[in-house]
Curated annotation (Swiss-Prot):
Gene transcribed to yield this protein: FLC3
Lumenal membrane side: 29-169, 222-229, 279-323, 399-405, 489-495, 547-557
Recorded GO CC terms: endoplasmic reticulum; endoplasmic reticulum membrane; membrane; mitochondrion
Organism field: Saccharomyces cerevisiae (strain ATCC 204508 / S288c)
The name this protein goes by in its record: Putative flavin carrier protein 3
GO biological process, one term: FAD transport
Region described as Disordered: 629-802
Location of this chain's protein in the cell: Endoplasmic reticulum membrane
């Protein structure tokens, strides 16, 4: 009798699945799965300890593994309602006695345990519509209300179905991760080669892409009532950006670590006695058999767990609740070691290739000399990328308390991330204010000092020089969001309301200030902020904040998926386009418009080894030396006019060693020397007479041409450009307005004070600047006539230096 009761009970469940399958879909094998049965009323007299049902429409087989308990002792009737995306599509009233299910006519109290297979009639199988097999992550469920013969409400159960088709795909996860990684790798490589404009653009766009991916995951971590399956599945594609990646052996290590450090690891993924619905987080009191899960919808017990928020994401990724924090922290540390190891190995390879003569000595010179500073800057940039991940997981660990050791690690990561970002922000503001005090432009030191640029450039190169401080606003915005997600998991409605307000304020601020380095980058980040605000608005419906019908939330779930999938595709294609332009372009800087903040005017060119001369300068000096040698050979004809020839001969004697050591390619060949001998004019006296006449009109050459600075070379014999007018600076900083005054004034290098020597001294305690003489690009000539006298920078600890 007990067996027949269980058998008929399973048949009832099979009927419910078939009714719901009218709006469901199957994968290629056309499989329908139901793994969770939850109660939808308090004190329900029918509940499930474990529930696993699989229906195969090809052979009409229904495999079920049930462990249920009931307290009903009467004749019962079932009111079955099937919902698709919140719309009721099927309603059926079933008298269990009329369908000859004797074990339900009447039902007696007890446990129901069965594992069996039943074949369903083709009448029900043929009712499944064809469109049901084409939609991924379909949102369908069945609600069964059980009453007795006097219409007394006895029990309510709700069953959620899955079809095996989903938009959460391994290929999508790898594609998004690889493209974002390519963007960061290219920006790092271009920075090493000195292509600053291209590197700044690709770095800014890739960082914005990372922050957008993380924002999608953050909004999906909110403790809302129920996330539509299509929206939850898309968020799973981007969970890798938060370090939540499942590796089986690592999960075993984390479980052992939590247990060995005083915690109790969870085993929900391997448990065979529990049913899990990945929608809501699990809380229940051990002394109560049934606990309310929401205001008016679902309930669970000690054997039926309902996850949502961070736990839901972890469960969907195959990570135990007590291993979520350990997983995120571990992948962050491992990726950091890989980054540092890559830079160190690359440096060793470059040094080895240089010593073996495989590459020229001038190649990667800046990287070889400042690789330690580049390594520090790369690690700071990496911590900046992982700031969202570290703060959210650390704050959430304080509420979960997996084990004392994990709590200590969370404290250390909070101090690490927040401390380093505060230090980078403070140093950036310090250097910018000192630059404004000295040169009336924050870009002078932020981009002119290689020490500052390599170490703290990640903090401000994405933004216009006048908005160097914007990352402080961005990090504060991220920090507040982390507080909401980490500490407010107990109240999803509180989270979504404050999250929407916060996103809205940031959206208005970024439109008002437009802080990024150029217009296209500003437009892209404004669009990202727009999508983020819309996502926050949609999750307000998922939290039942407005008490609307679930059909509204289901439609919003599809809007969330379509909008974010399309926008992610556009961003990924843009990064790939940038990568293609850089890989197939000889000069990637020409592909991008320079930022309108004069940063290129202050950035130094790629450093050269000591004792070498730029190729163009060496060619000019070689040509000047050849002319001087020709005149020296004709000195017998010009004995009365030695002024100019002495100057040129001295220039040749001083130039020849430097030219030879700087570039062997510039040395004249033997055939060129022979041709130069036979190419002299026949009337040599006439040529020397002409030279004698023109000599007084020429400028007096300095005695040491090789020691000429770039400024002296550029002004030697310079003439004003006819008809040339300078336009106003787009940055409105007043640096270009005094171009005419520069032509008549003395050539003063604003970055070098002969009375003070080096501008900055890293060995001193006055701010940690690097000792160097700044060289400014004279082709831009945008600084203007600095009327203010240079003064010694205040000390690092001097009063009032900020």
């Amino acid at each position: 009798m007990r067996f027949l009761q269980v058998y008929k009970s399973s048949a009832l469940i099979g009927l419910i699945i078939l009714l719901a399958s009218k709006v469901n879909l199957a994968e290629a094998k056309r499989k329908l799965v139901a793994t969770s049965l939850v109660t939808c009323m308090e004190n329900s007299q029918l509940s499930a300890n474990s529930f696993d049902v699989v229906f195969n429409p090809d052979d009409r087989s229904l495999h079920y593994d049930l462990d249920m308990s009931t307290q009903i002792d009467s004749y019962i009737f079932a009111d079955i309602d099937v919902y698709a995306y919140g719309f009721k599509i099927i309603t059926k009233n079933v008298d269990l006695c009329s369908i000859n299910w004797k074990q339900f006519c009447p039902v007696h109290p007890g446990n129901i345990q069965i594992d069996s297979i039943e074949y369903i009639s083709s009448e029900y199988v043929n009712e499944i519509p064809g469109i049901a097999y084409q939609v991924p992550d379909i949102d369908a469920y069945a609600r069964v209300k059980i009453t007795n013969n006097v219409s007394e409400y006895l029990a309510c159960i709700q069953i959620y179905f899955s079809n095996g088709k989903t938009v959460s795909q391994i290929g999508v996860k790898w594609a998004t991760a690889v493209v974002a990684g390519i963007g960061l790798l290219l920006s790092a490589i271009l920075s090493t080669f000195g292509n600053s404009t291209a590197a700044s653009h690709i770095s800014a766009n890739t960082m914005s892409l990372f922050l957008y991916f993380q924002s999608v995951v953050v909004v999906a971590m909110q403790h809302v009532h129920r996330v539509p399956p299509i929206a939850a599945a898309w968020a799973e594609n981007l969970v890798w950006s938060m370090g939540l990646i499942r590796i089986s052996f690592m999960q075993r290590i984390f479980r052992w670590y939590v247990q060995s450090t005083g915690g109790t690891p969870s085993l929900y993924l391997t448990s065979t006695s529990m049913s899990v619905l990945a929608q809501r987080s699990w809380q229940y009191l051990m002394e109560l058999p049934l606990i309310k899960r929401a205001t008016n919808v679902l309930y669970g017990n000690a054997n039926t767990l309902i996850f949502r928020g961070i736990k839901r994401l972890g469960y969907k990724m195959g990570i135990e609740n007590t291993s979520i924090v350990c997983t995120g922290f571990t992948f962050f540390v491992l990726c950091g070691y890989v980054l540092a190891g890559f830079i160190i190995v690359f440096k060793c390879c470059v040094e080895l290739a240089t010593r073996l003569g495989w590459i020229q000595k001038a190649r990667f010179w800046e990287f070889r000399k400042q690789w330690r500073m580049i390594l520090k800057g790369a690690l700071l940039r990496y911590i900046y990328i992982g700031f969202v991940q570290l703060t959210i997981l650390s704050f959430w660990e304080f509420t979960e308390r997996d084990s004392p050791a994990v709590i200590v690690i969370a404290c250390l990561f909070i101090l690490l991330s927040c401390g380093l970002m505060l230090w980078a922000a403070w140093r950036t503001v310090f250097f910018a204010r000192r630059s404004v005090a000295l040169y009336n432009n924050p870009a002078a030191l932020l981009y002119g000092d290689e020490y500052v640029l390599h170490k703290y450039g990640f903090f401000y190169t994405m933004f216009n020089a006048n908005h160097y401080w914007w990352n402080i606003v961005l990090l504060s915005y991220i920090f507040v969001k982390s507080l909401l997600v980490g500490f407010a998991q107990a109240s999803g409605q509180t989270q979504v309301l404050f999250m929407f307000i916060l996103d809205l304020f940031y959206f208005v601020a970024i439109i008002y200030y437009k802080p990024y380095l150029d217009r296209p980058t500003n437009i892209m980040n404004i669009l990202i902020a727009t999508v983020t605000v819309v996502n926050s608005f949609l999750f307000m419906f998922f939290s039942d904040l407005f008490n609307q019908s679930y059909k509204v939330a289901a439609i919003m779930g599809w809007i969330f998926f379509i909008m974010n999938a399309a926008f992610s595709f556009i961003l990924l294609m843009m990064i790939l386009a940038f990568a293609g332009m850089m890989l197939f372009s000889k000069n990637p800087d020409l592909r991008f418009k320079p930022a309108k903040d004069d940063r290129t005017s202050f950035q130094r060119n790629t450093m050269k080894p000591e004792g070498t001369v730029n190729r163009s300068v060496a060619n000019e000096l070689l040509a000047l030396g050849n002319v001087a040698k020709d005149h020296d050979d004709n000195s017998d004809y010009e004995s009365n006019d030695t002024g100019v020839n002495d100057e040129l001969k001295q220039a040749q004697d001083e130039t020849t060693p430097t030219t030879v050591t700087s570039s062997d390619d510039n040395k004249p060949t033997f055939s060129e020397k022979i041709l130069s001998k036979f190419s002299r004019p026949k009337n040599e006296n006439a040529s020397t007479d002409a030279l004698r006449v023109e000599a007084p009109k020429q400028q007096t050459f300095p005695h040491n041409l090789t020691n000429l600075s770039r400024e002296n070379l550029s002004t030697l014999g310079s003439k004003p450009y006819p008809g040339h007018t300078r336009s106003q600076s787009d940055a409105h900083n007043g640096l270009i307005n005094s171009f005419e005054e520069e032509d008549t004034s003395s050539n003063t290098d604003p970055f070098h004070d002969s009375t003070e020597g080096d501008l900055l001294d890293t060995s001193s305690s006055d701010g940690g600047f690097r000792s160097q003489n700044y060289v400014r690009d004279d082709s831009i000539n945008s600084l203007g006539n600095n009327k203010q006298p240079l003064r010694k920078p205040p000390g690092f600890f001097d009063e009032g230096f900020m």
